[in-house]
Every structure is written in C-alpha cells, then in structure tokens.
Design a protein with these regions (language model features):
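Short, well-ordered beta-strand elements
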Residues: 47-56, 108-111, 130-133, 181-183, ...
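N-terminal lobe/hinge region of extracytoplasmic solute-binding protein
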Residues: 53-104, 135, 220-223
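A bilobed periplasmic-binding-protein/Venus flytrap-type ligand-binding module shared by bacterial periplasmic
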Residues: 86, 241-245, 307-332, 345, ...
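Aromatic- and charge-enriched surface segment that lines or borders ligand/interaction sites
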Residues: 98-149, 182, 271, 323
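Gly/Pro-rich hinge or "lid" segments in bacterial periplasmic/extracellular proteins
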Residues: 164-169, 174, 178-179, 184-252, ...
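Structural transition elements
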Residues: 227, 324, 348-387, 401-408
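Extracellular/periplasmic solute-recognition and catalytic clefts
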Residues: 230-241, 258-321, 407
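Detector for C-terminal structural segments
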Residues: 233, 334-366, 405-414, 435-555
Length: 555
C-alpha cells in the first residue's frame, strides 16, 4: 500500500493521540500474547454504526488509483479480489470458487469464479470483470497513481507490451468463459495469491467503469464488498452502508460505518473516551514525554490494542554519488549508528533492526538481528572512515521532516556519524517534496527510507525496493544498487513453492544486499491502534488495520 511516500510511511498525529500509542511498550506484557485481538464473552450482534477517524482525506475510491493506507483500507470495505487477506495477512480464496489449476511449469493458473456473486448495483460478476480489473492496472492511458501496483502486475505474458502501448491487450490474461479466467505468467511466481489479493487487483464492474470517467468512478464506486458507499463529502466524511448483495453469509454485522475525515487529531482520543468515535484508522510515533504522560494515566489502557509491525526503516546509501561508491565508507556508516539510542529517541515504539525483512515475514532471519553483519562498533567505524580515504566532504542526508520524531531520529543518526568523522548535512523536506525520483536528481548521498509491506512476504520488499528493476529512472531505489546475483537468487526462489527452500534463497539474497551496505537497517516500527471497548470482535488486520465486516457493536 503506497502512502506518502510508500517506502517511508508515517502519518503524523499530535500529542494527545500519541499519548495513547505510547502505552504499547508498557502494556504488551499485561495484555498478553493475544493483545492484537479484543476478546468478548458475548457473540456477534447485528446492527449499529461504527465511527472511525482517519488522519487524511480521500481523493479516490477507485482501487486502481487509491494511494495511501487510509484509501486502501477503506477500499477493502467496498471490493473483493480473487483472494482476500485473512486476519493473519494470509491470502485465502474469495471471488475464486476453488483453488486454481496450476500447470506443471507453474506459469499458468486457471481460476473458476463463484457463481451468483453480484456487485452492489445488482450486476453479476464475470470473468470479463476480473480480466478487465487486472488489465486496467497496467493501462498506460489510465496512468494510475499506484505505479507500484503496475510493477507487480508486470508478471503476466504481454503485460509490458500492453503497459508500454505496444499491444492492445494482455496476452496472458485470458477469459475462457463467463466464470473461468486463465492467467499466464512470464515466470513462476509462488506468491501470486498475495498479488491477486492486493488492493490494486480488486474487481470492479467493467460495464460501469468503461461508461464513466475514472474520476467519477472514484467517487461513485461499485464493488462486491461488505459495504457500499452511501455518501461522500470530500474532507468531511464517507458513509458506508451494508451491501445487500454481499456474498459471504451472515456478514457484515454492522449496518453502517462512518469514516470521519475532519476531526482535529488532538481531540480524537477525548472523543473516543466520550463515545463520540470508536477508533482511529492508523497509528504514529510518540515522544519520550508522551510516554511519561501515558504511564501516569493507566485508565487509558483498555483503549489500546498493540499490533505486530509491518514496516522497517533504513538508510539508502546512493552508490552513484561519490564517496558512497566506497564500500569501506558504507560499512563505516552501518557500524556507526546506535540503534538502541534510536529506540529511546522514538519513545520505545521501535525495535532495533539489522535486516530489511520484518519479523512477520517467513523469510525473516532472526540470526541477523542477534549477530549482525555490521554490528554497532563506533571505533571500528572510525577506522574504516580513515581507511576509505574520506576527506571531510559534506554528505547530504535527505528525509521527510513532516513527522517530528523522524526529525529527532535523523538528528541522532547525524550525531553518530559525526562522532566517527563524517560531515553529515541533514536536508529535511516536506512529504510532497520527498520523492525518490526527485531525490535522484539532487545528488543526494543518503536518504531515510524503508518499506511497509503490501503483504507479508519478502518478494514485496525485494521486488519493490531492492531489485535491479527498481534502481533506474522512475524506480523506488534510493541506493541505485543492482546485484544481479541477488536478483538471480530471488528469481530461483520465485520458481519454488512456498516453504523453507524458497525462504532460504530470499535470505541469501538479503545477506548479499546487507554485505554491500547499500541499505543500512535502523529499526522496525512498533505499532498500536486506539479502539473503543464497545467494538466487539476487534483485531488488528496486518494489511487494512480495520476489517469492518467482522466487527460488531456491543450492547
């Protein structure tokens, strides 16, 4: 899910809300291992309205153009795909009626659709709608804001030719009959279900979309999801009501969901306590002062639900900008940064990181965090700086300065690097200006980056941020580094079924990137979400945060 910018998401929330979130570290032990789920003695209850505040406004409910966590999360209430992410972030069959028939070479997947599934306007879903929806992400005329979605869908035969305007259709997306679709891949892709469950591949009605402009459909969406959009006031609120045609029996429990878009973040916590709101759509980072305040108010504990982190933060070291082409200098930077201090600066809502894959991924390598390739060693870092031949030239570090705690974090990193003899100049820019393509044109040496996954698999991180394919013009790599051997390991992994063999190859590829020190891991985000106790069945969804169809209002 691509926020602003996708590779380093952190929406800002002021102090009062941050106080709530600061309780995460103190409460995890008391809430226990099931803290991401709120238990309820009573079963589901039908009816009622749930109101959730979101930090930003929405410009499109079109899944092919939705950018940012808030947009993607709410689109999850309107649409379905061939697969859907379950509460653990694993893809499960959704619009697909049965597991696909997969060819011996693992490049042809044939799906049969559920019959009788209808869009909220009553039209039945057919294979033509599915083919249209996937193809549309690649449409060069649409120019979707989710270019990251386009890059993931360039796995089908003929996808690149279509996306570049050289073909009128995608040869690898084939409709066999009204309920059967065949997808032919360029190469085996073991995690295709993850890609098909992602929001940009949600299914939309071809007849409706082709009859209207993209802008119109973005504010008048038609989907198959548990809810449908009743009304939308830009920058004010979006009201969703139960979809009478929803195909999962007994769902949803709620009659209505209201996404409130204009609440002053500073009063959200107070409004939740008063029962005027039921929760906040996402999370952010507190300061140490916020933590101290929260610990003095234990009454707020019942409103906080911790969640496992889906994001890691790191520094990109631009190998195309001397002296960052010097391995010894990059190694010095990797060993100079005190990650324990960063955790303190971020109020405890971070975990030291020495790798790029987050703990929720099956390819996460625990040994790298226990025995880092480049451990914290400022003395050795200083020696490497001298050995590199560095002569005090300014090194520019770009970062998004819209979040105060990120500013504090970069100041701490700057101090660490200065202590080993590096002349680091911070250049904080606004969220809008912090764009990787623009940064490439400014001769940066380093930038604060990272990745927040669309699904918990290493291919999401590697393919979107680390591969050779994304280090050129228009790509998201700020390091501009290409390791063909690592790419070959990932290609080999993608040809294997999910499991230990595939995971091991991803770990080997990651180790090569880490040894090159083009990406310097800093921390994993420690997250939480604020929820009213009256919300029944709540759990934190690792992709959408809120999965409204499964919640109810306690009476």
């Amino acid at each position: 899910m691509r926020p602003y910018p996708r590779y380093h998401r952190r929406p800002f929330m002021p102090a009062r809300l941050l106080v709530m979130l600061a309780l995460l570290a103190a409460l995890t032990s008391t809430l226990g291992a099931s803290a991401t789920t709120r238990q309820s003695a009573a079963g589901p209850v039908y009816g009622g309205t749930l109101s959730v505040a979101y930090a930003g406004g929405f410009t499109s409910f079109d899944p092919a153009q939705a950018v940012g966590y808030d947009w993607v999360a709410l689109n999850g209430t309107l649409y379905n795909g061939l697969y859907q992410f379950d509460r653990h972030g694993q893809p499960r069959l959704d619009l697909a009626a049965a597991p696909p028939a997969i060819s011996a070479d693992h490049k042809t997947w044939t799906f049969t659709l559920r019959k009788g599934v209808r869009f909220s306007n009553g039209m039945e879903v057919t294979a033509n709608d599915v083919a249209f929806s996937i193809t549309r992400v690649l449409d060069p005329k649409l120019k979707p804001a989710v270019s990251w979605g386009q890059s993931y869908d360039e796995i089908f035969q003929g996808s690149v030719e279509y996306a570049t305007g050289k073909a009128k259709s995608v040869s690898g997306i084939q409709v066999l009959d009204p309920y059967t679709i065949r997808l032919v891949l360029l190469r085996p892709t073991a995690n295709l279900p993850d890609i098909l469950a992602s929001s940009y591949n949600f299914v939309v009605p071809k007849a409706v979309v082709t009859g209207e402009s993209a802008d119109y459909f973005g504010s008048h969406p038609v989907g198959t999801g548990p809810f449908m959009l009743q009304s939308y006031q830009k920058g004010v609120q979006a009201v969703f009501v139960k979809n009478p045609h929803y195909f999962h029996p007994g769902k949803p429990y709620l009659d209505k969901v209201i996404a409130v878009l204009t609440v002053n973040p500073g009063v959200i916590a107070l409004r939740i306590e008063k029962g005027q709101l039921d929760g906040f759509g996402w999370y952010s980072d507190p300061t140490p002062a916020d933590i101290q305040h929260a610990r003095a108010d234990p009454k707020l504990a019942s409103y906080l639900v911790p969640a496992a982190s889906s994001a890691a933060s790191w520094l990109d070291l631009n190998v195309h900008e001397p002296p960052m082409d010097n391995l010894k200098l990059r190694q010095a930077i990797a060993m100079a940064i005190n990650r324990t201090r960063i955790v303190q600066v971020r109020g405890g809502l971070a975990i030291p990181a020495y790798q790029l894959f987050v703990p929720l991924m099956p390819q996460y390598d625990r040994s790298l965090d226990q025995h880092p390739i480049y451990p914290y060693d400022p003395q050795r870092a200083a020696a490497l700086v001298k050995a590199s031949g560095y002569h005090n030239q300014p090194l520019t570090l770009f970062f998004d300065n819209s979040v105060p705690v990120d500013v504090n974090t970069m100041q701490a990193v700057q101090q660490d690097l200065q202590q080993v003899g590096l002349n680091v100049v911070l250049r904080g820019v606004s969220t809008v200006a912090f764009d990787p393509v623009e940064i490439k044109l400014r001769g940066h040496h380093m930038d604060l980056s990272g990745w927040s996954y669309d699904y918990p698999d290493a291919y999401d991180t590697y393919g979107g941020k680390l591969s050779c394919a994304v280090n050129g013009a228009g790509g998201l790599s700020g390091a501009h580094y290409c390791d063909p051997t690592a790419d070959a390991l990932v290609a080999k992994a993608q040809a294997l079924p999910l499991g230990a063999g595939r995971n091991a190859l991803f770990r080997q590829a990651q180790a090569r990137i880490l040894r090159a020190a083009t990406e310097v891991p800093l921390f994993y985000y420690a997250t939480s979400i604020l929820v009213s106790p009256r919300v029944g069945g709540f759990y934190f969804h690792p992709i959408f945060a809120w999965q409204f169809e499964n919640y109810w209002i306690k009476h």
